[in-house]
Regions:
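Extended, charge-rich alpha-helical interface modules
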Residues: 2-74
Length: 74
């Protein structure tokens, strides 16, 4: 386990900021991805790539939900 992982797992003043920062970055990336999913360029991709990007969006949303719950639980 890396030092960074330990910081997030071990209760302290910094873990909350780490999780909040991760959630902010993730949310920004998710917004950009969702915009792309409805763009004309998205439909120029192969069916496989479109499906993978949709799956990625779902996974990112689930991850954001988990981070939010972690922040709410403490």
């Amino acid at each position: 386990m890396t030092d960074e992982a330990v910081k997030i797992i071990v209760p302290g003043s910094e873990w909350r900021e780490e999780v909040l920062s991760e959630l902010k970055r993730l949310t920004e990336d998710l917004v950009r991805l969702r915009r792309f999913l409805v763009s004309e360029d998205f439909y120029k991709l192969s069916e496989q790539q479109c499906n993978l990007l949709r799956n990625q969006s779902t996974a990112m949303s689930q991850y954001a939900d988990i981070l939010t719950k972690r922040l709410q639980s403490n």
